[in-house]
Amino acid sequence: MVVKYTMSMSFFVIFASTVTIIVHGFPSTLDGPLNPVTAPLDPNLNPIAFDLPESDPSFVKPISEFLLPEQISVSLSYSFDSVWISWVTGEYQIGEKDSAPLDPNCVQSIVQYREFDVRRTRKQNATGHSIVYNQQYSSENGFMNYTSGIIHHVQLTGLKPNTLYRYQCGDPSLSAMSKEYYFRTMPKSTSENYPHRIVVAGDLGLTYNTSTVLGHILSNHPDLVVLLGGFSYADTYLANKTKLDCSSCHCDQNGTSSDCGSCYSSGETYQPRWDYWGRFMEPLTANVPTMMVAGEHEIEPQTENNLTFAAYSSRFAFPSNESGSFSPLYYSFNAGGAHFIVLNSYTLYDNSSDQYIWLESDLIKINRSETPWVVATWSLPWYSTFKGHYREAESMRIHLEDLLYNYRVDIVFNSHVDAYERSNRVYNYTLDQCGPVYITTGAGGAGKLETQHVDDPGNIPDPSQNYSCRSSGLNSTLEPVKDETCPVKQPEYSAYRESSFGFGILEVKNETHALWSWNRNQDLYYLAADVIHIVRQPEMCSVCN
């Protein structure tokens, strides 16, 4: 089913609040559980994504002053009255361990800003901090070590809710300021205030498909973007720019199978792809608050110091301190009357872990009269029926699902699986009207589309043999868990699944109703293939704390 929106369009991202969607007659979670649907694969769709060439104009550093800001992005703080502005100045370096990095103190981190429609108001100045990071390889490849340009982070505070601001970033003392950009703050957190449109996309990469996704996202004028892991895909390249061919690599994300080869053991990445990605995404990230959720491709382990997530945690700003997690891997923030919780699939989550303890404390503190909607997001999906990913994150689910269920999380977004899937409300593999709706949006442009399901004919194992239909017994942090019987048909908790590249849009209408849509690359930007009203029932599903 392809659904056309009736839209009131505008020409600029800054006027996103004027864009509306008029919808009638779509199914609702109140109608559920809905019968499982598997959308047929489009015969004209190439399921393999091809990377854009390194010569793509959007990758190239602008020919300008050395310290002029680039790779500019806006991200939210915990509440409406604060945002972060991040950017890069200078050029990265590739060389030996003892090569001198750029000095962060050689250029200031300053943002000048004011309300968009108050022309006579003096600009305000905010200052921040700057860093550089290193990505180091084994001693034999030390000549390929990467040192970033200077990465700046500035927090703006005291902002008004739902207000358009204009800003420039850089160092005015060096005449090294960016052009003017715009962002809109989130509405104040009440049961009546929500951002008009929230885009959710995962596993973007830098492919021709990513170009289409980015263009469609911009045309839909979002107020907020949530990007789930799989950004630059720098880890799919060696440090010498050689692309790793993993298309025939039949192994899980832990690299436990014998044929994984260099795809999971090289210990190398090509870090300049992070710079390409920052430039490529700037038309979106410089104007629309964008929140990042780490996934597998952001781990990037460094062989000699065991450091992980260096690029991810250095390049973006997170409301970690404001939300009390003090970690870029998991944090929370408010977007009007919606409370978002970001978790990490690749760090410890058992009940004695820092992540679990923080999650429980964050859930306890939520005021549902101010933020009725609670949305959680992380990389590995708990409820995927695609072959190779069925129950892939089982140990994480076992440790955390009760928490999310008892505190009545409404929606969960995941990525990692290069396909789209939406569940009925579910808890512990059982249909439950108080369980979350789980949505996998891991087809943002990169990788190869998953087209086989665990229940497809030929994928169902012989029950007389000792066979696991789950590709992995663990997900890189905890011990394996016992598997269950493989399904012989699409599980009833799987409401809709489709192999297509695209992204999703969440529009929260009020404290009980939200509209979700899946937008495919092969369709026009205003068309949706899967649309449903997600309805909360707080009277029936009270918080069990």
From Swiss-Prot:
<feature type="glycosylation site" description="N-linked (GlcNAc...) asparagine">
    <location>
        <position position="254"/>
    </location>
</feature>
<keyword id="KW-0732">Signal</keyword>
<feature type="glycosylation site" description="N-linked (GlcNAc...) asparagine">
    <location>
        <position position="321"/>
    </location>
</feature>
<feature type="binding site">
    <location>
        <position position="203"/>
    </location>
    <ligand>
        <name>Fe cation</name>
    </ligand>
</feature>
<dbReference type="InterPro" id="IPR008963">
    <property type="entry name" value="Purple_acid_Pase-like_N"/>
</dbReference>
<feature type="binding site">
    <location>
        <begin position="416"/>
        <end position="418"/>
    </location>
    <ligand>
        <name>substrate</name>
    </ligand>
</feature>
<feature type="glycosylation site" description="N-linked (GlcNAc...) asparagine">
    <location>
        <position position="510"/>
    </location>
</feature>
<feature type="glycosylation site" description="N-linked (GlcNAc...) asparagine">
    <location>
        <position position="240"/>
    </location>
</feature>
<comment type="similarity">
    <text>Belongs to the metallophosphoesterase superfamily. Purple acid phosphatase family.</text>
</comment>
<dbReference type="GO" id="GO:0003993">
    <property type="term" value="F:acid phosphatase activity"/>
</dbReference>
<feature type="glycosylation site" description="N-linked (GlcNAc...) asparagine">
    <location>
        <position position="351"/>
    </location>
</feature>
<dbReference type="InterPro" id="IPR039331">
    <property type="entry name" value="PPA-like"/>
</dbReference>
<dbReference type="Pfam" id="PF16656">
    <property type="entry name" value="Pur_ac_phosph_N"/>
</dbReference>
<feature type="binding site">
    <location>
        <position position="416"/>
    </location>
    <ligand>
        <name>Zn(2+)</name>
    </ligand>
</feature>
<dbReference type="InterPro" id="IPR015914">
    <property type="entry name" value="Purple_acid_Pase_N"/>
</dbReference>
<dbReference type="GO" id="GO:0046872">
    <property type="term" value="F:metal ion binding"/>
</dbReference>
<feature type="glycosylation site" description="N-linked (GlcNAc...) asparagine">
    <location>
        <position position="466"/>
    </location>
</feature>
<protein>
    <recommendedName>
        <fullName>Purple acid phosphatase 13</fullName>
        <ecNumber>3.1.3.2</ecNumber>
    </recommendedName>
</protein>
<dbReference type="Pfam" id="PF00149">
    <property type="entry name" value="Metallophos"/>
</dbReference>
<keyword id="KW-0378">Hydrolase</keyword>
<feature type="signal peptide">
    <location>
        <begin position="1"/>
        <end position="25"/>
    </location>
</feature>
<feature type="active site" description="Proton donor">
    <location>
        <position position="389"/>
    </location>
</feature>
<feature type="glycosylation site" description="N-linked (GlcNAc...) asparagine">
    <location>
        <position position="125"/>
    </location>
</feature>
<feature type="glycosylation site" description="N-linked (GlcNAc...) asparagine">
    <location>
        <position position="367"/>
    </location>
</feature>
<feature type="glycosylation site" description="N-linked (GlcNAc...) asparagine">
    <location>
        <position position="145"/>
    </location>
</feature>
<dbReference type="InterPro" id="IPR025733">
    <property type="entry name" value="Purple_acid_PPase_C_dom"/>
</dbReference>
<dbReference type="InterPro" id="IPR041792">
    <property type="entry name" value="MPP_PAP"/>
</dbReference>
<dbReference type="GO" id="GO:0005576">
    <property type="term" value="C:extracellular region"/>
</dbReference>
<feature type="glycosylation site" description="N-linked (GlcNAc...) asparagine">
    <location>
        <position position="475"/>
    </location>
</feature>
<feature type="glycosylation site" description="N-linked (GlcNAc...) asparagine">
    <location>
        <position position="209"/>
    </location>
</feature>
<feature type="binding site">
    <location>
        <position position="233"/>
    </location>
    <ligand>
        <name>Fe cation</name>
    </ligand>
</feature>
<keyword id="KW-0325">Glycoprotein</keyword>
<keyword id="KW-0964">Secreted</keyword>
<keyword id="KW-0479">Metal-binding</keyword>
<feature type="glycosylation site" description="N-linked (GlcNAc...) asparagine">
    <location>
        <position position="306"/>
    </location>
</feature>
<feature type="glycosylation site" description="N-linked (GlcNAc...) asparagine">
    <location>
        <position position="428"/>
    </location>
</feature>
<dbReference type="Pfam" id="PF14008">
    <property type="entry name" value="Metallophos_C"/>
</dbReference>
<dbReference type="InterPro" id="IPR004843">
    <property type="entry name" value="Calcineurin-like_PHP_ApaH"/>
</dbReference>
<dbReference type="InterPro" id="IPR029052">
    <property type="entry name" value="Metallo-depent_PP-like"/>
</dbReference>
<comment type="subunit">
    <text>Homodimer.</text>
</comment>
<keyword id="KW-0862">Zinc</keyword>
<keyword id="KW-0408">Iron</keyword>
